[in-house]
């Protein structure tokens, strides 16, 4: 753990509060050379209603925080190659595939997702993964 991990993961937790999702709010920050280059939180695509659930089920088109942060940096024309992703929940397998393809070299998270296949895939791809405890 480096001295900035705690600060960035706390910032990701604050960013998660922007999510309209009721079941779980997740925030993500992409950091490169000690600068935040992108951010994201889980929610519906731009232009859609700000409701993530229908009844007690998450709508299938809700984007995860990691996907939002990665697509945002790609849209800006910047590169996430070699960046660190700070995310409040461990990535699912779909987000892990995006993380690998985006060239992100390190993932720091605070809460466990119900499945750990995403973490296993990241490690298999040589991405450094670290869980940090936040009080």
Please state what every model-predicted region is.
Residues 1-135:
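Zinc-dependent deaminase catalytic domain
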């Amino acid at each position: 753990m480096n001295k900035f991990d705690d600060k960035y993961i706390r910032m990701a937790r604050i960013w998660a509060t922007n999510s309209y999702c009721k079941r779980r709010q997740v925030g993500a920050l992409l950091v490169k050379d000690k600068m935040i280059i992108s951010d994201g939180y889980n929610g519906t695509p731009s232009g859609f209603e700000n409701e993530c659930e229908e009844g007690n089920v998450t709508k299938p088109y809700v984007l995860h925080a990691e996907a939002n942060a990665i697509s945002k940096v790609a849209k800006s024309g910047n590169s996430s190659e070699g960046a660190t992703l700070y995310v409040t929940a461990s990535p699912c397998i779909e987000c892990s595939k995006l993380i690998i393809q985006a060239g992100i070299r390190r993932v720091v998270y605070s809460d466990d997702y119900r499945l750990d296949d995403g973490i296993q895939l990241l490690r298999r791809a040589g991405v450094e993964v670290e869980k940090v405890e936040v009080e």
